[in-house]
Regions:
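Surface-exposed, glycine-biased beta-strand/turn segments
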Residues: 18-133
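Positively charged n-region of N-terminal signal peptides that target proteins for export
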Residues: 1-4, 19
Length: 133
C-alpha cells in the first residue's frame, strides 16, 4: 500500500511537458476555390502519397502564393516532382511545393544556368535565408 501511495504522489507531482502549440495563420496558395486532385496518404502504385495535390481549373501556369511570410529555402528540378520550391515560414512551418510548371524569372535563369553548367536536368540550389523572401 505504501508503494501505491508513493507512486500516486509521484504521478500527481509530475507536470506534463509538451511542445507549445503554434498558432499560425495561413492564406490559400491560389486565388480560386481549392479542389483536391490527390489526397495525403492515398494509395499509389508503390507508395502512399505524401502530400496534397490541387486542381488548377485545367490551366497550367496559375500563380502559386506562399501561405505566410517566409523565404525559399531550397529550389529543385527533379524527374519525379518537376519544379520544386521548399518554403520556410516565419511561424516555424514549412511547405514543399512540387509539380510547379516553372519558376519566377530570376529563379528560372539561375536554375537554367546551373543545368547547363552541370549538363543535367536535375539540379538543387540552397539559397541563403532571405535571398528569396
Amino acid at each position: 500500500m505504501k508503494q501505491y501511495i508513493v507512486a500516486l504522489m509521484l504521478a500527481c507531482s509530475i507536470q506534463g511537458h509538451s511542445q507549445d502549440v503554434k498558432q499560425a495563420t495561413f492564406v490559400s496558395p491560389f486565388d480560386f476555390t481549392l479542389t483536391l486532385s490527390g489526397n495525403f496518404g492515398e494509395i499509389r502504385a508503390n507508395h502512399f502519397h505524401g502530400g496534397l495535390d490541387f486542381k488548377t481549373q485545367g490551366v497550367i501556369g496559375k500563380p502559386v502564393r506562399a501561405l505566410a511570410d517566409g523565404y525559399i529555402s531550397r529550389i529543385r528540378v527533379t524527374n519525379g516532382s518537376g519544379h520544386v520550391l521548399d518554403v520556410v515560414y516565419n511561424n516555424g512551418y514549412t511547405t514543399i511545393n512540387r509539380h510547379l510548371s516553372g519558376f519566377m524569372p530570376d529563379i528560372a535563369r539561375r536554375v537554367e544556368k546551373l543545368q547547363y553548367e552541370k549538363e543535367d536536368w536535375e539540379v538543387e540550389i540552397v539559397p541563403e535565408p532571405g535571398e528569396y523572401p
